[in-house]
Each structure stands twice: as C-alpha cells, then as structure tokens.
Amino acid sequence: MGIKDWPEGEGPRDKLLQKGAGQLSDAELLAVLLRNGLAGLNAVDLARSLISEFGGLRNLLCAPRNQVCRLPGVGPVKYAQLQAAAELARRVAQENLQRGQVLTNPDLTRDYLMRQLADRSYEVFAVLLLDSQHRVIQFVELFRGTIDSASVYPREVVSLVLEKKAAAVIVCHNHPSGIAEPSQADRRITERLKNALATIDVSLLDHMVVGDREIVSFAERGWIN
C-alpha cells in the first residue's frame, strides 16, 4: 500500500507536521527525504531496506554515489537529496562554532568535530585555529586520504598558522573504520607537529581522533605536555 493510501495523519510527512520531527523513526525521516518508493515498496519500506542494506544511517549517507544509486528506487535525484540533508547537518554544526567564539566547553568542540568528520568515508586531517584567547579563527581541512606520518607535512600546518596569525591550534583527524584509538603513526605525527609549532611559539593544545561514536583526546591522555 502506498503512503498516500494510509489513513490521514499516519504518513511520515503528516506525522512530522503534527508531532514534530523528533517523533519519527529513522526510516520515517528518511522516507520524507525520499518522497516516494517504487512499485510494491512505499517510501517507508524503501527507507527501511536502505538502512538495513548499509547497516545504518551514517553508512548510508557517507556511501559512495555508485553504491547508493545501484539500488532499485534510488537514482541521482534521491542521492542528491540525501547528500544535501547530510551537508546541511554539517553546516548547522559549523554555525555552532563560529569565528570569535571562545572554546571553554570541550563538549562543544567534540560535538563539532564529530559532526564534521565522523561520517566521512575517507580520512581527513584538519586544523582548528585559535587566537591567544582561544577564540575560534577558522576550521581548515588540510589533507585527505591515508593519514600517516609521511602524508602530513608540518611545514604546511606552520604556514597556515602564520597566515591566519593563530596563537594555538587543535589538530584532528578521523578514522573511517569507526575506531578512534590512535595509532603509533598518529602519535608520531603529533610529536612532529608539536615540535614544529614550538619553533614559532604556537601551542598545540590537542590532537583529537574521531571515530564512529567517540573521540579520543591526546591531551586527556597526557600525550601532549
């Protein structure tokens, strides 16, 4: 049965308007974005099948286009709608950490970095630039791909810091595997960056590794002195 044939108020769009988006299941929210299903499968059923196929919303939203569009009922238009929704969520998070904001709340930083990096299917190394009062200057993605001690260049980080006149930085990167535990390569990168930044009297406050559901802080583990 198509959603249009459901009793009034029971469809996901009606339910959202009457009760609020927070009352919808993952499949119902996804169905609102998909708008319609395909022959023999309404939008909610299609949404459930997609969530099941990819093992969750996060995996679905960060899956490559060719993997999503190969499935029945999902073409370029629906893929674009899903990507637009994911990008809007990231931009909302970015607005929550605006230029000039003082970083006094570690949870705000964690939430921001989680939203920016947790859903990436590839590794990203980024720098959060701060002034002498620990106010945000800018968040910059510097490197993409396999992040190891050979692919992160301290001189590029130093060059960016000098260009933006930052006084302190927090570096971060994600693990697409979802496991946030830092590797030995991560620790080597951190030591090289700390030493390079020290030559220009800039503090490395932390290196945060973003996983699927957690963030590991080098500072909290006592790995940055």
Curated annotation (Swiss-Prot):
Q: Which residues form the MPN domain?
A: 102-224
For Zn(2+), which residues are the binding ones? 173, 175, 186
Motif JAMM motif covers 173-186
Say if the entry is tagged with keyword Hydrolase.
yes
Q: Which CDD domains match?
A: MPN_DUF2466
The family database entries (PROSITE patterns) matched by this protein are listed as: MPN, UPF0758
Gene Ontology annotations of biological process type: proteolysis
Task: Tell me the protein's name.
Answer: UPF0758 protein Sbal_0377
